[in-house]
Structure formats: structure tokens, C-alpha cells
Amino acid sequence: MIVLSKEQIEEMVDPDQMMDQIEEAYRIYGSGEFYMPPRPTVEHENKQLMYMPCYTKDIIGTKILSIFPENSKLGLPSIDGIVLLNDYTTGAPLAVMDGQSVTAWRTGAVGGVGIRHLSRKDCRTVGIIGAGMQGFHQAVYACAARDIHTVYVFNHSDRDLTDYLERLKKAIDKEDVKVVQCKAVEELVRNSD
């Protein structure tokens, strides 16, 4: 069985390949070649566990998500989880993966696929509202989907984004891409394709 940590997943992710796999997932969804039951949720004392299984003809994927709102007081994420993969024929466990990382990269890839198919081919700038995990990954995939030269980032809080912007530039991994913090959402909208 394979066990993948956040760091290992981040080393392995290829944005173009991930977007291709998301397109394949859309094809499977459109064809109905899957079974996804309603997701059961177990709640106790303001804590939740959500189970999200999905079966295809080859594999079973299950995301188990924990929502523990009090974790923020401990400096921990209030939402966490894992992703399990099992063989469809035997049920044998194949992989356990960090759920936060898989979710962030997958959700970013969904946005990238949208940009691939719905944006102008000549887009050179993109605006990201929210300097959190999802905004980070949406920016990475926007730059993979189009020849983006400038990423504009606006965050609702006044916190210093220097470290965030540097990590984002490194993750985008294209020398000619600038990452710019906007002071107002209007500035972001005005400058974004």
C-alpha cells in the first residue's frame, strides 16, 4: 500500500497531467460510469466526520473529512482529512493520501480546466480573490492553463502577504510571471483578463 504525505504529493503533482485527469473525471461523470452514494456524516459535540465514497469500474476512492471547529483555537486546521483508494475487484487498500493536499490540488485543477475551456486563449493576467489555500492552487493552475504573465491577488484581511506571494511565485515556477498584491478588489478586477 502506498502512503503519500502532503510533501510527497506536492513533489509529484504535474498541473497539466492533473487537469487532463480532471477532464477524464468529467467524461466519466457525464457517461454515468460511476456510483457515488450520498455522503454520510457522523456528528458529535460540534465535530463532524464526512465520508465521500465514489466507485468506478477500476477503483474506489473515499475522502474522509473531519470538521473540528475548535481546532482553530489550537492553531490547527479546522478541516482535515485523508483520501483512500481501494481496488474495485478485491477491496484491497491501494493508497492513503493527505486529504488537504489532494483536495487543494484537485480543486485548483478543476478551476484550471474551466480556464482551459472557457477563457480567451490570449489571457495574460488573472485575478485571485483570497490568499488562502484554494486561491493559491487556483493561481498555479491558471498559470498552467494559460500563458499568464501577472497574477493579481487581493485578500480581505490586511495581513502581510509577502511570504504567501513568494511561495506562490515559486509554486508557479515560471520566471516571467509576476505576482502582485492588490490593495482593493477594484484594482484586481480592472487589471485581470
Give, region by region, the residue ranges found by the protein language model.
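N-terminal Rossmann-fold NAD(P) dinucleotide-binding loop
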Residues: 135-136
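Aromatic pocket-lining residues of Rossmann-like dinucleotide-binding sites
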Residues: 142
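NAD(P)-binding Rossmann-fold cofactor-contacting core
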Residues: 145-172
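Short acidic low-complexity segments
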Residues: 175-192
